[in-house]
Amino acid sequence: MKIIGIKKIPVKFFENSKGDLLKFVSKKDHFFKSFGEVYFNEINYKKKKGWIKHLKNQCIFSVAFGEINFKLIDGRIKSKTFDKEENITLNKNKHSVLIVPPGIWFSFTTNKKKSILVNLINGTNSLEETVKSKKIKNYYIK
């Protein structure tokens, strides 16, 4: 089921024999709110990261290298899609950004040797703004 507010948006990809160019974000993009921080997150084969939920920040994700599989669960109690789940894959072949609004739990993994995730948040990360858990519903992160 589609979670309200989750968007996977194709972005430009420029093939080049010297190395491809992958667009990430422009301040002109309709989904761009503001710049807070950018993180590059490496993930190794079959490892899982998460569960994470931002209380105020929107995440804009893109894959810089490899392929990443996301598990998303709506944690917004007043949402029509509360507790619903969605699986989304990002990779270079179908280059896209994934917009995750505040209140959505997410985790991610890769089936590649290594993948790199880029995450732009519209505010600054803090312990008060970010919630982490090892288990959401029946899904565990070790």
What do these predicted ranges mean?
Residues 1-94, 113-142:
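Non-catalytic, conserved peripheral segments adjacent to functional cores
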Residues 90-112:
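Conserved metal-binding segment of the jelly-roll/cupin
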